[in-house]
Amino acid sequence: MSDNTALRPVLDLVVLDCPDALELARFYSTILGWDLEAGSDRDWSTLVPPGGGVTPERPDGRPSLAFQRIDDFVAPTWPGGAHPQQFHLDFTVLDIDETEPLVLRAGATVHEHQPSENGGFRVYLDPAGHPFCLCRG
């Protein structure tokens, strides 16, 4: 098998389904400090990381985070449930307790299930109900 990196795909976007793309993009913009791309709206919104996203000229850039409105969106249920989570986002922070007020003010809620036995991460729900974690770096 050839190891020609020019032929390998490059991760450009991670896209979250949600009931309102602009609302969820604003939430993640607040907690990450990323810019909302011009032209974002309730159907499709994109956040661009500092320094810009991935481009063909810069395949080692950081992937952007996008949101798309889905009619009849149903939030994932975790752990278990009729609509299981298919993936989640982990954010590394220096101090979970110091960062928690930021995500709560932005609209997150603390998930009732906290499986970390050593306090290395804490689970939250974003305004659309997607689980995400703050992880001690």
Predicted regions and their residues:
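Short amphipathic alpha-helical segments
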Residues: V10-V14, Q85-L89
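Short beta->alpha transition motifs characteristic of CBS
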Residues: R69, L134-G137
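Core segments of cupin and vicinal oxygen chelate
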Residues: D3-P9, V15-L65, T99-P101, R105-A108, ...
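Residue-level marker of positions within ordered structural domains that often coincide
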Residues: G33, L94, L134
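Conserved, structured core segments of small domains
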Residues: V54-A82, F87-H88, L94-D97
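Short, acidic, Ser/Thr-enriched surface-loop or helix-capping motifs
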Residues: D126
